[in-house]
Swiss-Prot record:
GO molecular function: acyltransferase activity; lysophospholipid acyltransferase activity
Name of this protein: N-acylphosphatidylethanolamine synthase
Membrane-crossing segments per the record: 21-37
Keywords: Acyltransferase, Cell membrane, Lipid biosynthesis, Lipid metabolism, Membrane, Phospholipid biosynthesis, Phospholipid metabolism, Transferase, Transmembrane, Transmembrane helix
Principal subcellular localization: membrane
Entry's Gene Ontology cellular component terms: plasma membrane
Taxonomic superkingdom: Eukaryota
Membrane topology according to the record: Single-pass membrane protein
Origin species: Arabidopsis thaliana (Mouse-ear cress)
Subcellular location: Cell membrane
Similarity comment text for this entry: Belongs to the taffazin family.
Source species taxonomy: Eukaryota, Viridiplantae, Streptophyta, Embryophyta, Tracheophyta
Region (Hydrophilic): 122-163
Length: 284
């Protein structure tokens, strides 16, 4: 599917009133679920708060996390104290599944004004709406992604990541700050197999929700690009009906084979950071 209500995502849409209304309402809901209906705790919250509020101008922020439930976003932000989820200008942009969040015009409008970018699962890393996500990074905004690509509620190591987040890092003119976050307990609040394989109609109460913020992941993108280009020279390009566009990153031109090497390297580093943080979260 092409662009969905992109006009509703603009900050000047109807003077910003719909965005302010939706974000304030969703934030109130998230805080109620996280702090009134459940008990929540956040570890290393200041790292995220400082990056959201006072990172260098023009530098984008990407937060990456595991995906435990359909309510991870926005409830995980409701666990933070202060204005993290209440300020419409500072609030995150988030990649959201088109088949869940954009099923009809009403849902589409609400999620669009709430700073959600529709993504077609299985649509590839160069689908049309990924360009909008890239534009948000070019604007220096904060973008949240779930690089696992779907909800996983088992307490197992972080699975192989999809390449969408890696492609955004590589394509961004300014290398984003990438911050890993792990959360636990959300699978109990919104279990996938609650009632004959269905989710509960409302979040379940009296659960302990835990959010653990890591430290920014260090990426030497120019070195990773150089390595990807060198490694790709010894690999036969894959046969595909639709070729990826040529990418220029860190001053080098990458064909599809080189891009695959780069995206694998970036994704593996994010996956490793998330897994390290997941193990830490289990001990806290």
């Amino acid at each position: 599917m092409g662009k969905i209500m992109e006009w509703a995502a603009r900050s000047d849409h109807l003077g910003g009133i719909p965005r302010n209304t939706v974000i304030m309402a969703v934030s109130a809901f998230a805080k109620a679920v996280a702090n009134l209906c459940n008990k929540s705790s956040v570890h290393n919250a200041d790292t995220l708060m400082n990056l959201v509020q006072s990172r260098p101008p023009g530098v984008p922020l990407i937060t990456v996390s595991n995906h435990m439930s359909t309510l991870d976003d926005p409830v995980m932000w409701g666990a933070f104290k202060g204005l993290l989820s209440l300020d419409p200008e500072l609030a995150r942009w988030v990649l959201a599944a088109e088949d869940i969040c954009f099923r009809n015009p009403i849902f589409s409008y609400i999620f669009r004004t709430g700073k959600c970018i529709p993504i077609t699962r299985g649509g590839g890393i160069y689908q049309e709406n990924m360009n909008e996500a890239l534009q948000r990074l070019k604007d220096g905004s904060w973008l949240h992604t779930f690089p696992e690509g779907k909800v996983f509620q088992d307490d197992v190591p972080i699975r192989r990541l999809k390449w969408g987040t890696a492609s955004l890092i590589a394509r961004s003119p300014v290398t984003p700050i990438v911050l890993p976050i792990i959360h636990r307990g959300f699978e109990e609040m919104m279990p996938e197999n609650y009632n004959n394989g269905r989710r509960p109609l409302v979040p379940l109460p009296n659960k302990h929700l835990k959010v653990v913020v890591g430290e920014p992941i260090e990426f030497d993108v120019p070195m990773m690009v150089e390595t990807a280009v060198l490694d790709s020279r010894h690999v036969t390009p894959p046969l595909q009906e639709v070729k990826w566009p040529v990418l220029t990153s860190a001053g080098q031109v990458l064909d599809e084979t080189a891009q695959r090497h780069l995206y694998i390297a970036l994704s593996e580093k994010i996956q490793s950071s998330l897994e390290t943080l997941r193990l830490l979260a289990k001990r806290l």
